[in-house]
Amino acid sequence: MPDMQTSRDTRKIPISKVGVKDISYPIVVMDKNRKFQQTVARVNMYVDLPHHFKGTHMSRFIEILNAYREDIALDKMEPILQEMKKKLGASSAHLEIEFPYFIEKRAPVSGARSLMEYTCTFTGTLAETFDFVLGVQVPVTSLCPCSKELSRYGAHNQRSHITVRVRYAGFVWIEELVELIEGCGSSPVWSLLKRADEKFVTERAYENPKFVEDIVREATLALAAHEAITWFSVEAENFESIHKHSAYAAIEQDKRKA
C-alpha cells in the first residue's frame, strides 16, 4: 500500500513537534510510603519532522506506548524516547505525562485521614542528550496581608495553586516537593477537616498572611536549599475571592549557573 507519510514535501519547512496528544493511559509511579502507585495519565508524544517528509507515522507512537503498557514509569522515560527516535527516524523526541497523584494526609488537630490529589507531570526530551523535568501542582490557602491590615472583621482568603518544575541530580520524591511547597502559602489544605481542624486552619491562615509575591519567594528559598535540585521554576496563582481576576507571580532559577 502507498505510504503517503514518507512521500516528498517540497515546501522545505521542518516541523519542530508532531505526534499524538491527550492519550489516556495507565501508568505506575514510585510512591515514597507504599513503593508504587497506579494512576491514569494523559500522555503527549511528539518528534521532529525533517522538511523533506510529508508526514510522520502516527500509529507508531501508539505502538511504542503499547509496548511499555505494563511498565510505563519514570525510569522508562529515556528508553521510550529512544524508541520514538529510532522508529520514527527523528533527531528529537518529546514525552509529556500528566497524572493525578494521591498522598494520605492527617488533619492538623483531629488526625482524621484523607487522600489529597496533586497534579504531577513528567516531561522528557531526547535530542543529543536526555532532559527530564518533574512538575507538581500544590493547592494552598492564601490570605491577603493588605485586606487583613485594612479590615476590622477579617481578611479575604482563597485557594491558590503553586506549580513547581524541577531538574535534579539523584532523585527527588513527589512527596518531598509537596512538603516543601505546602508551607509556602498561608496554610495547607486538606480533603477532610473536622470542626477543630477548621478552627486551626483558618486561624493559622489569618496569622500567616501572604501575597502571591511572598508565596513564590518562600518557594524559591525552599527549592534553592534542596541539595538535589539543580534548576527550578515556581508559579503561584491566587484565585482571588473578591476579584474576577487571579493574582500571579513566577520565578525561575538555574542553580548550575550560580
From Swiss-Prot:
It is an enzyme of class 3 (hydrolase). It holds the Pfam family GCHY-1. Its EC number is 3.5.4.16. InterPro entries: GTP_cyclohydrolase_FolE2, GTP_cyclohydrolase_FolE2/MptA. Pathway: Cofactor biosynthesis; 7,8-dihydroneopterin triphosphate biosynthesis; 7,8-dihydroneopterin triphosphate from GTP: step 1/1. Keywords: Hydrolase. It catalyses: GTP + H2O = 7,8-dihydroneopterin 3'-triphosphate + formate + H(+). This is GTP cyclohydrolase FolE2. It comes from Geobacter sulfurreducens (strain ATCC 51573 / DSM 12127 / PCA). The lineage of its organism: Bacteria, Pseudomonadati, Thermodesulfobacteriota, Desulfuromonadia, Geobacterales. The gene is folE2.
